Amino acid sequence: SAYASEGKYNDMDMLEIGRGLSEAEERTHFGMWCIQSSPLLIGCDMTAIPAKSLALLKNKELIAINQDPLALQAYVVKVQQNGVYLYVKDIQILNGTTRAVAIYNPTDNEQSFALNMNDVDLDGKVKVRDVFAHEDMAEVTKGVMHVNIPRHDTRIFILKGEKRKLRSIYEAETAWLERYQCLGINNSLGYAKYGDAKFCSGGGKVEWLGNHKDNYMEWRNIYSKEDG
């Protein structure tokens, strides 16, 4: 997520909507492309696309997340033990009280997820908008929202809190790597890379830092209301 900004987007390749995926898989596919601010390139035969697939591609609320002027890419803040991922990003105002979240279930079974507002840095009463269903949900007043996610499906919500809490965890995989590559022998060449790590909060880590003066990692989006 550190590499996405206005005019610089991670291209996740063309969309496979309308080409045989299940409805749940299409929601995941298009929803993740939108919350990651990936370019949206339709890759199906538009003369034969199913009506539900076309309606998904025309979902204005999802497209608004994709085209949000902050141009941010969502990042993982939590991987639950049942394999469900929680993604989040600011929309509309940087470090504001409105955030987009995606709860992604890649498993082959329906899963439950307890969305704790502390994990997405929101406080007080939180308004919830389901962007797939185009409807407002019950306001979260006790800090936790319980969600069921079918197999291979994703739920995407717009959350509007009363207050914004300061982010307390900056995962390694959200940092900028000045010298990054995923090929070759990184240590001897002085390049860092990202790797999987189940014991880490977001399920990822950074490896092979050092061995070159420019082989470092940094967070470029740290925010605090006060100095010090």
Enumerate the predicted regions with their spans.
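Glycan-recognition surfaces
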Residues: S1-D45
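Short intrinsically disordered, low-complexity coil segments enriched in acidic
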Residues: S1-S5, L86, G228
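Active-site-adjacent structural elements in folded domains
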Residues: G18-G20, Q81-V88, V140-K142
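Catalytic cores of secreted or luminal carbohydrate-active enzymes
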Residues: T28-K78, H152-T174, E178
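Surface beta-strand/loop "capping" patches
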Residues: V76-T98, R167-Y170, W176, G210-E218
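Extracytoplasmic
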Residues: Q111, V120-V131, E135-G228
